[in-house]
């Protein structure tokens, strides 16, 4: 077969000559032959060109051209994640998820309602945040251990976690893209004058406040949030940018395993009705291995990953060594200027995620019996 460039140019000349022949009034179309267009030594291979071959090669050439320039543009715009300028045109907010939480905005503080598991989770996540933050400071004030710290609560909802952090002495900013959630949170904190001073709520997404809050917070909390965002990489990059050097990032979320699908979606949403249907999307769940890879590649060093299990019959959470369902993670932002290159973690990828999905061992059944 002839090369694509030669075939394409010769085919174009041949078709162009035919068009000019049919349009000309001086040349009789019945007498027009290929010998009038090409010398004899070229006829042997020109006549072998078939229309489908020409079209196929033209399509292949166009695709390769497009892919090549797309790759070049990507390489040209790429920068290291911690130095890449952020664009607010990229969003982490899923509008469909917003509709789900908008319908439930008035039920945040019903401790026996759909958010009962989140109320109960405070028994684990508040001490988890407090204890890990205290390891980063030399001294603290009794009764107000987080006094002097500034914390960002991303996806704060009605303020279920924001208020306990404020009671520990921290200055907390809670953000949520659903305005009705923020109104509920503001109304609830207004009953406590102390919290009213320590807590501030804003209706916005994380990426919308990055520009004005670079290296502002001692800690960023994203509890039960990352399984709802549409761009986890961008989300983690924003967390990195708003953290002070040596700042802490706290995440609680759901592992991406077959067990988490069976219990977190099928049982919890469709059978038991513990949470409303459509609250979670299994494709957005993230394994600890994948989350750690994203964190490390964006300048955040993972310190702790620990499993959590919820007993729907008792309504209580407890810690577990097994991370097949829910888990909590704590990462620190490095204070060094030079960060680890993303290439070091690029090979972790899918292999680790597949291993995580197979980690539904017998320890889960033992923990669920407790």
Curated annotation (Swiss-Prot):
GO BP field: methylation; ubiquinone biosynthetic process
An example molecular function term from Gene Ontology annotations: 3-demethylubiquinol 3-O-methyltransferase activity
Main location group: mitochondrion
GO CC term, one of those recorded: mitochondrion
Keywords: Acetylation, Magnesium, Membrane, Metal-binding, Methyltransferase, Mitochondrion, Mitochondrion inner membrane, S-adenosyl-L-methionine, Transferase, Transit peptide, Ubiquinone biosynthesis
Reaction catalysis annotation: 3,4-dihydroxy-5-(all-trans-decaprenyl)benzoate + S-adenosyl-L-methionine = 4-hydroxy-3-methoxy-5-(all-trans-decaprenyl)benzoate + S-adenosyl-L-homocysteine + H(+); a 3-demethylubiquinone + S-adenosyl-L-methionine = a ubiquinone + S-adenosyl-L-homocysteine; 3-demethylubiquinol-10 + S-adenosyl-L-methionine = ubiquinol-10 + S-adenosyl-L-homocysteine + H(+)
Needed cofactors: Mg(2+)
Coiled coil (UniProt feature): none
Modified residues (N6-acetyllysine): 144, 150, 197
Pathway in which the depicted protein is active: Cofactor biosynthesis; ubiquinone biosynthesis
Class in the EC hierarchy, top level: transferase
InterPro entries in the cross-refs: SAM-dependent_MTases_sf (IPR029063), UbiG_MeTrfase (IPR010233)
Cell location: Mitochondrion inner membrane
Subunit structure: Component of a multi-subunit COQ enzyme complex, composed of at least COQ3, COQ4, COQ5, COQ6, COQ7 and COQ9.
Family indicated by similarity: Belongs to the class I-like SAM-binding methyltransferase superfamily. UbiG/COQ3 family.
Role: O-methyltransferase required for two non-consecutive steps during ubiquinone biosynthesis. Catalyzes the 2 O-methylation of 3,4-dihydroxy-5-(all-trans-decaprenyl)benzoic acid into 4-hydroxy-3-methoxy-5-(all-trans-decaprenyl)benzoic acid. Also catalyzes the last step of ubiquinone biosynthesis by mediating methylation of 3-demethylubiquinone into ubiquinone. Also able to mediate the methylation of 3-demethylubiquinol-10 into ubiquinol-10.
NCBIfam families documented for this protein: UbiG
Protein known as: Ubiquinone biosynthesis O-methyltransferase, mitochondrial
Organism, scientific name: Bos taurus
High-level lineage: Eukaryota, Metazoa, Chordata, Craniata, Vertebrata
